[in-house]
Amino acid sequence: MVNTRPIAAIDIGTNSVHLLVARPIDGGPPEVLTTEKAPIRLGSGSHDMKRLDPDAMSRAVDALDRFRQIAEAHNAEIVAVATSAVREAEDRSSFLKRVRDEAQIDVGVISGVEEARLIHLGALGSVPAADRRHLVIDIGGGSTEIVVGEGTTAILARSLKVGHIRLTNRFFPGGRIESDQVRACRRFVKAFIAPVAREVRERGFDVAIGCSGTIENLALMAADRSGNPARTVDNLALTRGALSDLADDITSRLEPDDRVDIRCLDPHRVDVIVAGAILLRELCKAFDILELVVSAGALREGVVLDR
């Protein structure tokens, strides 16, 4: 049976604001009607991410008003969720009020654990791994979600306050690299993820899945370097060896301008891809991941599947 009314899933993240309009289908993946993305950078307002960037708030409100109009054109039910940047911001109430008043959207601020649960559902919608114990990793701008699952049940769900924008703000402000900063970032990440790494290794997994923009972009860059450029990220494999080689190249390019000619690098990620590559490489080492399978599904798809 088909649910005749589409869902407009809106994800207000630390780096970008996304829209997915899709029609849920019983027993199958949702039918995607349209998608939109606006690179807002809400989480760049302060070093500690306790304040939202004022200009980014205005950009977000404008994007959300446009998303509402798109959703209404599809007669879709709007489900909007906000994650790390809004979750932690001391001024989140004023931002949410602006969104409600100016874009006419009520936003739910979800916990890190709920974010992980929805990401897990969305990832499994694209990578058929429910029959095996699996690990899901989602690197965002402000947080990283880790799930070990069996079927559609999460037996371990963690949300870590570490992401590519948070690390960039701390270690690589402006996107410029110093070699001692790279070493410091690696040491910090290694220590920060050690407790969850022990939990993951204790539970074990048969397949590792990665999702969202940072992992997708790294996988596309690695595929291009292998001589087999990918047309889609879904089910694309990223080996630890290929990731390590790519991360070495990225961290050797000291200025953001030095990275603009990296093939397949999203131009909106030139400054934050350094932190993203370091974080993913350290996660793969700590979890003993030899190969990561990329899922195009994540939070937004999980919101649709959860309705």
List the model feature ranges, each with a label.
Residues 13-15, 77, 93, 140-142, ...:
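Short flexible coil/turn linkers enriched for glycine and charged/polar residues
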Residues 135-143, 147:
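A generic, well-ordered mixed alpha/beta core segment in the N-terminal half of proteins
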Residues 2-7, 21, 45-74, 83-133, ...:
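Helical "lid/coupling" subdomains associated with nucleotide-phosphate turnover
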Residues 8-10, 79, 135-137:
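Short aromatic-hydrophobic micro-motifs that form the base-stacking/packing surface
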